[in-house]
Swiss-Prot record:
Pfam families: CRAL_TRIO_2, Macro. This is Protein GDAP2 homolog. Residues 46-228 form the Macro domain. Residues 281-313 are annotated as: Disordered. PANTHER family: GANGLIOSIDE INDUCED DIFFERENTIATION ASSOCIATED PROTEIN 2-RELATED, GANGLIOSIDE-INDUCED DIFFERENTIATION-ASSOCIATED PROTEIN 2.
Amino acid sequence: MTTTPIFSGKIDYKEIKTWDQTEFDEKNLVNDKDKVPIENFHINGPIQFKIDTEINSRICLWMGDICNLNTDTIVYSNSKTLTESDTISDKIFKYGGSEMMNDIQKNGECRYGESIITSGGNLPSRFVVHTVCPTYNPKYLSAAENALNSCYRSAFHLSMDVKSKSISFSTLHSEKRQFPSVGGCHIALRTIRRFLEKPFSKSFEKVILAINTFEDLRLYEQMLPIYFPRNQQELKFSQISLPKDVGDENGEAIVESRKIRIIETPSTIIREPEDYNCFYSNNNNNNNNVNNVNNNNSNNNNSNNNNSSSNNIDIIQKNNKNEFNNYKYDSIDKILNPFSSNFSSSPYDATMDNDSFMLKREDPDIEKRRQFSKKSEKQIENEKLKAQFQTLLTRSKVEDLSDVSRLNFTLQTTDDQNRPIVVIIGSQLNSRKDLYDQVLLYLIRVLEQTIQRGNFSIIYFHSNMSSQQSPDLSWLKKLLEIFELKYNNYLKDFNIVHPTFLLKTTLFISKSILGDKGVLSKIIYHENMNKISKLISKCNIPKSIFSYEFSKNEIDNFSFSFDNDVTL
């Protein structure tokens, strides 16, 4: 039987300075978004997070090991099975003891955004809240953000259930989950602020943010004035720095398309004629008509019995006709929505909001499908291609392409009019066909720099390229589509030197697929280097290209017949 070790090194949370006691540091007011000087900024519009000295007296920022704090509850992040090993969790389970493990086994697995509470064992804190931070995925951004928001809220509510008066949070958004530090910090602070604004949060005397790295400490020092301003200067800084979406009353991100949509009653409804009587509202008129018919019948009893029946029938038909014409029908809106102020005259009903909860908004899914259906197949393909190009462009800016750069397959020079020329050596890629994906990114990076100088030309050397080492048709198709999308308007001509029969065939097939326009219409084949020799004289062309030129065109000397009148 193992015994739980005794914890030493307890820190009294009451000795930690609260946010309102922390010295104001103007250096923390760093605004990188709009570069607006704080003193020149004027507050316009509603203030999202006002100066609240009572809340500021309950929030604390502290750097250290959360396990040392003697708050009633400590909160940390773990995996769904609560078996993740790191500095904090290892220490918690070391001193938590068998009682904590029993509580975990009773609760079982914990899902993303949820929390469970257990005994603190021999830790200074009485309780430990185990929560599960979601794995960050930009594709499911709102789900990840709201799950992290739920981690903080569920921890607060579980602590309230056990009558905690103090609580400390570690940094729940962890690097293991790829959660951005800045985004996670925004969610944490706005969720805590929204909770402390609620009346039932008064039971918490202290809420401590226990930070364990200097990077996070610096980040929280810059973010706290945004959500917990202490003076007018920080309030102005908050107005500048707040993101557009500050969430709802709980700090949870608002997803417009997920709001409840209930259709409002239609203004008209088609009914069968025999069903109209169910909408009659002129009850007094109905009674009068019936009385008139009865009176007429009683008078007619004194008349000739032979004429009695016919007269009664005429009177009833006449009254029914007048009755039908005089009836006023209630609209279906009033019948199904009788409390709407549009149809009511009572003072109480007049105060009802016209935009009631039954107001319908267009289903965003239907709206998107409607817009999508209006687009042609070509428009849809262009949008997909633009999205793919934006992804490639972003990757070309951030990825490490040093391996491709060392191949030296691109050179740059200028023509006699000082227009840029991009020279591509295909044989330099012969042995690295596995890098074609990075080659595409590198070409995008080079061309993005080139178009800053205006129109340009390309000279591509296909010398010494074997059929096995040539790029496949799908890669070439993607390259041509990107050129057509972004660089066609800048491209003056596309010169291919030493083309093979296979390359010409491949490009011919590409013309049949993509059409003989754009980049493909600007291709110029050169069987030798006579017409481009003047242009490439400034480049350090590999000797293998000259060797190929000599052997293919049976040249036995190093002189070329230059055509000085030819320019690209």
